[in-house]
Amino acid sequence: MQYTFPNYYKEFSCIAGACPDTCCAGWQIVIDDQTLKKYQHFKGPFRNRLHNDIDWKQHVFRQYNRRCAFLNEENLCDIYTEAGPEMFCGTCKNYPRHIEEFEGLREISLSLSCPEAARILLSQKEKVHFITKEKKTKEEVYDDFDYFLFTALMDTRDMLIDIIQDRTVPMQKRLWKLLAAAHDFQLCVNKNELFKWEEIRKRHEDSGYGDRFCSKIYSRINADNIENSSAASACANTPEQLFKKMWKAVVPEMEVLRPGWQKYLENCLTPLYNGNTDPQPDSGNLYSWQKSEFDFSYPDWQIQEEQLLVYWIYTYFCGAVYDDEIFAKVKMAVVCTLFIHELNVGTYLKNNRQFKLDDQIRICYQFSRELEHSDLNLNRFEELMTEKEIFSFENLLKIC
């Protein structure tokens, strides 16, 4: 069995009571069958509490006010203190370690939903790389696992990460290239033409980011603008209006895991989407000006944006071996990262133009919790990338 993990993986150590939040609230923690049996046979004074605060039908810990029943007032776990760490279920033992399973391979990441894991990721200045180690285990075989597609996805992901990490190129062009390549790979899968993948990879690598590449992108954007050429359509296709529509397409579809999440979004985004124009002449609307101001005031975002894109692509891209949804996964990576940027700018404005690493960490882990702590949300978000016209290839090119 091969195990792959990011180079910063072993930097993680739980900070327990010093954590600004808790991983034991806002989501249902599923208990694995092996641990359930241990709980059933547990003896001692903690037995009654253990039995009463587990939903044995659903195989989850009960919750009170969205908090795990075993989470005490100090935000520490009573199972740990009363029964010992060996009584943790698989989820609690592993978190924030996230594992994607493939035949003969486990890909491990640190979930962005953990504040300390988010801090480690966002503090990385060097390009993230991945380490693979091998352990002797019983050979496994997955029924209907398309190994040919999987190896193509692995090679393609390496290429996409190389694109994201090319710091000689402005991020806008990297995002364009990322989307364009994923778009073409998806067409190949749709036509069952995997044999063309190598040709597509080479074409995108050779085309670089020069005038020819940019002219193709501009042509795609302009063709879409001509198709929607009325004054009303043009106004509705500005980056600001597109982002507003994207939020409106996503938020109502999501299960709310923590009370106050939608109010938090409103408070963050209202300063950014207030509809005014910049009082300074010829400097564009206030929206664009404020985003540029944030990027100048918080230069760390340049690298943090890269690290977030790599995080999403590494974690989810190769899952396309199970559903063929290549483009949707890349779209999701781009949209999630740009949504976080919008929340950054709104927070910067709300906080009187102050923004620090702690703000970035808080935004990232809260966003991740609402998305990644719910399979329903994660799956629905990805589905929306394909279902909703607002997330079209052309619209995403416009907001990069």
Each language-model region and where it sits:
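Short linear interaction motifs
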Residues: 4-5, 73, 320-323
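Local cysteine-cluster metal-coordination motifs and their immediate loop/turn environment
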Residues: 11-29, 63-98, 111-118
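Short, compositionally biased low-complexity segments
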Residues: 11-18, 127-132, 236, 312
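General N-terminal leader/first-domain-start detector
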Residues: 1-46
